[in-house]
Structure formats: C-alpha cells, structure tokens
Design a protein with these regions (language model features):
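Structured alpha-helical bundle/scaffold domains in large eukaryotic membrane-trafficking regulators
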Residues: 47-51, 100-108, 247, 435, ...
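FAD-binding FR-type
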Residues: 135-224, 240, 373-380, 434-458
Length: 458
C-alpha cells in the first residue's frame, strides 16, 4: 500500500484515485484492517483484556477476509478460499472432537459417573492464596503427563475457554486443575469456589483436548524439574509418572531433581500430598530412582526475622539470604537479596557452608518466626511432608543447581521448567550458558542436555 501511495503522491493523485477507483478503496480498507490485526496482537495491547482481544481478533479476521474477497478478481478468489477452508476445517474438527469427548452417548458409562448428556462435571474448591481446585471425575479420554486442555464452564464463565495443565495422571481416574485467580475467568472461578457451601454441587463443563507434546523423560539419566507457583501442575505429573515407572521397573532414569518455587507456605499445600507420595514411594526402592525435592518459599511473612537495628537484621534462610529494612522493600514488603543453594558455591561445587552468589532472591521483612529449623519442622509437620523434602527460604541459585546435576549425570540430562516468564528466562539463559561452557555442541563428548520450557498463557 505504501508503494501505491508513494507513486500516486508524486502527482497529488491520492484523493482523486480513492474517489473514482472502488478497487483502491477496497484495498485500502483491507490494508487498514490488516494493520489493526497486527497492532492488536502486540503484547501490551493484547494483555489489557485478553477476552476482548480474542473476540475482536476473530471479527477482524472475518472482516479482512470478506474485504479481500470483494477486492480481488474472480480468477484469484481461489487463493482467498484456501485459508478460509483451512480455518473452517480446523473449527469443524475441533468441534467434532469436543462433542465426542463431552457427550456421554459416545462413551460407556463408568461406575459412579453422573447421569446426563454432558459426560464431564466438575467441582470447584477454594485453595489457599486465591487458587481454585477444579476436579472432574471419570474423564472419557486418556492423556500424558504434562499435557493441557481447554476448559469451558458455561454456567460460570460463558463464551470462554482457557488452557490449563492437567495436574493428575490417567491412573488417578480424574482430571484436576489448580488455577490461580488473576482476573476475568479465573477470578470468577475462584469466587464461585469461595462462595460455594458444602456439599459442593458439580457443574457441567466442556473439555477440549488433550494437547501438548514433549520428549519422554524416561529416556534421560537425570531429569531436573523446575516450577514456579502453579507451574507445578506441569512438573508434578512428570515426577509422579517417573516414580510410577521406577516402581514398575520400567525406568532408565537414575535421578530426578524437583525444584518448586512458591511465594508462601500456603501454596505448598496445593501439591503436598502428591509430593509426599512420590518421595515416600521411592524411599523403599533398592538401587532405584533417586528423588531430591526442594521447595523454596520466597515471600512468606511468617518465615523471616527482622531486628530493630538495620545492621543487626537477621534471616532464617538456610541459603544465606539477608533481610533489608522495611523501608527498602516494595509495596508487598518483599526484599531482594543474594543467596545460593545450601552446601553449594557459585561454581556448583559442594561445601559444608553456604556462600553468597550473585543471584537475586526475594525474601520478606515481617518478623514472626525466630528459628529456621523450627519453622521448617512446623511446615513439614503441618503439611505431612517427609524430612527429605528440603524447605528453604529465598530463591534457588539455578545456575549452581543445574550445573551440579549436569556434572553428576552419567548420561543425557533433561531440564523441564514451567512458571512465570522471569523463571523461564533465567532457566533458558543458565542452561544455554552451561551448555556452552561444557561444549556440548562442540564435539567434546559431553552428554547432551534437553530443555523443555512450558509457559502460562497462550
């Protein structure tokens, strides 16, 4: 369009051309709609109101295609129908798949399944820290650990479907999702769960999926699973699946390093039962899978100590985090300090004492607890977690942690991460840097590293 405008502008012909030439007006209209489609997909605009973005994006696509159909000559319309056919085929296949998964007429009724035309009915339970547990018993399909579905609940969030990772295994015979409330649909789900009184009535839901694929982790010698907040819905099923395979004697993986970063101890309860079961299942195995699990609590006000004097401030963190004055903290009274893993230095070597490393760590400055060991013990007792699950304050030194596992691996290693954008970016950067240092791709003979990054959103 710029080429035409530049050519017409030399002769001041643009207004006259648009006035007398309907084809030019149609082309300009299509170009304007296409420009809006591109601009509206930019993250700052898209994230203002995602539900509105989806609706206007579909409407804009239909409008753009219609204008182009009118604009092009008759013998060129086939090139417009081609993408329309692809889009409609996708919609038809997805609709048929959705109907098959959710209509009970296509499936044999399982014992305990609710009667009705819709085969999937969900209960909603409020969890600590504004999270919602969505549970769907007796699903009609199978899935693999780490896969996700699009969940649609017309009675609570009409005309919307959102992607959520399945937090259970097929052997559990139920679908479960842990959904953190933000805004829009997730906030309405939490409000419904929080306001519901027992016994909780189930709601009809539609499930579209499962989707997602990754390399089987059981083919690696060492697996590092890193999650932030509800990212554990991705890593926990992977951990449980590896443990299950190990108990059945069908696993080549030697070690799993499980790291979960949360803001408060209330979030640990989301998967405390599953984590306890996985750790206890491998505890009795002879020469079986080794699971090393750590939970890092970054911003819980009950887990830090602060004295009146700035220089005398102390921390209960087992990883060497220090507490700053409240005046230096953010609005949520969350301070950033430096920390490393317990027993590890920056380079990844082990040491009986902790040594600070240049890694930003978030801890809090509101004093309640007075001794770290007492706090950790109380958390483990409260959540019935075994002592082998390390509870730490502050953020992990991911470079040292990952490097240690790669150095100790006896074969190829895999790193899988799911969480906020910041966590994913750090893991990407650290794994890439370590691979360069180890010269994995430069013919040194070092074993390869597989990295899988799973993110929130679309």
């Amino acid at each position: 369009m710029g080429f035409f405008f530049k050519s017409w502008g030399k002769y001041k012909y643009i207004p006259k051309k648009l006035e007398v030439d309907i084809i030019s007006r149609q082309g300009l209209g299509a170009w304007c709609v296409l420009l809006w489609i591109i601009l509206s997909t930019l993250a700052p605009i898209r994230n203002i109101k995602y539900e509105f973005f989806v609706v206007q994006h579909v409407i804009s696509y239909v409008g753009f295609t219609t204008i182009v159909m009118i604009h092009v000559p008759k013998d060129m319309k086939v090139w417009v129908w081609a993408p329309v056919g692809i889009y409609l085929t996708d919609r038809v296949v997805r609709t048929l798949y959705l109907v098959y998964n959710n209509i009970s007429l296509f499936h044999k009724r399982k014992a305990g399944a609710a009667a009705g035309l819709i085969s999937c009915r969900a209960t909603f339970t409020a969890l600590p820290d504004r999270a919602t547990l969505v549970s769907i018993p007796n699903p009609t399909f199978k899935w693999k650990p780490g896969q996700h579905v699009f969940l649609h609940c017309p009675s609570i969030v009409p005309l919307q479907s959102h992607p959520f990772t399945i937090a259970t295994l097929p052997s559990d015979n139920k679908l479960e999702f842990v959904i953190r409330a933000h805004r829009g649909g997730t906030r309405r789900l939490f409000r419904h769960a929080n306001e519901s009184l027992p016994p909780v009535a189930s709601k009809a839901v539609l499930v579209d999926g499962p989707y997602g694929r990754m390399r089987p982790l059981e083919q690696f010698d060492t697996v590092v699973l890193i999650a932030g907040s509800t990212g554990a819905t991705f890593t926990m099923p992977l951990l449980r699946d590896l443990v299950r395979r190990s108990c059945e004697g069908k696993l080549a993986t030697r070690k799993v390093r499980f790291v979960w970063v949360v803001k408060s101890k209330g979030q640990v309860g989301w998967f405390a039962k599953e984590l306890r079961g996985a750790v206890e299942a491998v505890a009795g195995l002879q020469d079986g899978l080794v699971v090393e699990a750590s939970v890092y609590i970054t911003c819980d006000t009950t887990l830090t100590v602060e004295s009146d004097g700035g220089s005398d401030a102390s921390s209960i963190s087992s990883v060497g985090a220090s507490i700053e004055k409240p005046a230096l903290c953010g609005g949520d009274r969350c301070c950033c300090t430096d920390t490393v893993l317990e027993g590890e230095k920056e380079g990844g070597s082990t040491s009986p004492t902790s040594s600070p490393a240049p890694r930003n760590t978030c801890t809090c400055g509101m004093p309640i607890a007075t001794a770290e060991n007492e706090v950790v013990t109380s958390i483990q007792a409260e959540l019935s977690l075994p002592e082998s699950v390390n509870i730490k304050t502050g953020r992990p030194a991911l470079r040292a942690l990952i490097n240690r596992e790669l150095e100790q691996a006896r074969g190829e290693a895999a790193v899988a991460v799911c969480g906020p954008a910041g966590l994913k970016g750090v893991v990407r950067r650290e794994v890439t840097g370590l691979c360069d240092e180890r010269a994995v791709c430069k013919g040194s003979g070092a074993d390869g590293v597989y990295l899988h990054v799973e993110g929130f959103g679309w």
